[in-house]
Amino acid sequence: MAKFIKSGKVAIVVRGRYAGKKVVIVKPHDEGTKSHPFPHAIVAGIERAPLKVTKKMDAKKVTKRTKVKPFVKLVNYNHLMPTRYSLDVESFKSAVTSEALEEPSQREEAKKVVKKAFEEKHQAGKNKWFFQKLHF
């Protein structure tokens, strides 16, 4: 079977706390690891997507509405639904590792790096579908 869950692929979480949220796969583990002996992926996703902005809104409101709240997580392949979309993960790939997920302070640092990268992509107008709320 071809490996279609690759780094940079956008997926949707279908189970758990983040069900219905869009994620991008940072590092896939097809064979599993010693600590997690099942196929899984380290993902970075959007917990709260940015809201719509209009011209008549003042700068303070625009900055508040364009904030992205990210999360980083280890997710079983069974709980991911891959999409046809992809996203560049090189800007935060080194920060989001399995070691960073173990330690709470490193996890927070990884989230900050991901947040900065996601907000830059959103401001640039790239990957519009990824930054929209999934309506279902």
Swiss-Prot record:
**So which domain of life are we looking at?**
Eukaryota
Chief subcellular location equals cytoplasm
GO BP annotations of the record are: translation
Report the Pfam families cross-referenced here: Ribosomal_L27e
- UniProt-listed CDD domains: KOW_RPL27
Recorded family membership: Belongs to the eukaryotic ribosomal protein eL27 family.
What binding partners and quaternary form does the record give?
Component of the large ribosomal subunit. Mature ribosomes consist of a small (40S) and a large (60S) subunit. The 40S subunit contains about 32 different proteins and 1 molecule of RNA (18S). The 60S subunit contains 45 different proteins and 3 molecules of RNA (25S, 5.8S and 5S).
Name of the protein: Large ribosomal subunit protein eL27
The source organism is Candida albicans (strain SC5314 / ATCC MYA-2876)
